Amino acid sequence: MRLIILDTAEYVGEWSAKYVMKRINDFKPGPDRYFTLGLPTGSTPLGMYRHLIKFHQQGRISFKYVKTFNMDEYVDLPRDHPESYHYFMWHNFFKHIDIDPENVHILDGNAPDLVAECDAFEEKIRAAGGIELFIGGIGPDGHIAFNEPGSSLASRTRVKTLAQDTLEANARFFGNDISKVPKQALTVGVATVMDAREVMIMILGSHKAFALYKAIEEGVNHMWTVSAFQQHPHTIMICDEDATLELRVKTVKYFKDCYKLSADGLEQATLRN
């Protein structure tokens, strides 16, 4: 596991976008070889999306031969609702780049058979050859996608009833009216993300510091689902300084030293000077 600690949330977004761009460009995707990318929603990846849009506009990256799979979607929320993840992705990312809509895969929370929708999503991932890079964020309780505390670490894409804490946290997006927050969602499972060849998890802010501590310094625990990625062979966790407040000083120093000595760290230091 790699932990990359950067000064600010803005720099996390920039670094993440550069990493995604490098992975796609190095892969050299084409009509017979698509790059498959797993994507999150929420405030955490917005900076990354903004930078990827900028890089695309500069001609530094194309998404023509990229297939995407999003992590989750609310149940019974219209696609054109401002809080639906379909709406979020199209308005914050997809409509600004050259991706073919046929290559975008987002779970349909209005499907007549939700279980069949989840099974079909897993099959689409398999048919695409699996996911090269799955990007995620986490909640203050360490959940990834809608795999909340207590979720099986062997879980696949499924229907999930949301916890009361999640409903209360998301009420701010629905006019602070908890009755308007969808009670269920479709979500990829922990094992779905673990199957990706590489996982990059973004953590921003002091309110997620305890979750990062649980993910890095303690053992694997289904009450902190992000901790499962300790066992993935290629996990990158990238965070800002505020997110490290619960980590031991020696832990922070160790990972900062590792980054400075890495090729990525040397390259980024050069870019910033």
UniProtKB/Swiss-Prot annotation:
GO molecular function (one): identical protein binding
InterPro entries (alphabetical): Glc/Gal-6P_isomerase (IPR006148), Glucosamine6P_isomerase (IPR004547), Glucosamine6P_isomerase_CS (IPR018321), NagB/RpiA_transferase-like (IPR037171)
Catalytic residues as annotated in Swiss-Prot or TrEMBL: D72 (proton acceptor), D141 (for ring-opening step), H143 (proton acceptor), E148 (for ring-opening step)
Record carries keyword Iron-sulfur: no
Pfam families (UniProt xref): Glucosamine_iso
Main localization category: cytoplasm
Catalysed reactions listed for this entry: alpha-D-glucosamine 6-phosphate + H2O = beta-D-fructose 6-phosphate + NH4(+)
Entry EC no(s): 3.5.99.6
Localization (cell): Cytoplasm
HAMAP family in UniProt: GlcN6P_deamin
Role this protein plays: Catalyzes the reversible conversion of alpha-D-glucosamine 6-phosphate (GlcN-6P) into beta-D-fructose 6-phosphate (Fru-6P) and ammonium ion, a regulatory reaction step in de novo uridine diphosphate-N-acetyl-alpha-D-glucosamine (UDP-GlcNAc) biosynthesis via hexosamine pathway.
Alphabetical list of NCBIfam families matching this protein: nagB
Family: Belongs to the glucosamine/galactosamine-6-phosphate isomerase family.
Quaternary organization: Homohexamer.
Protein name: Glucosamine-6-phosphate deaminase
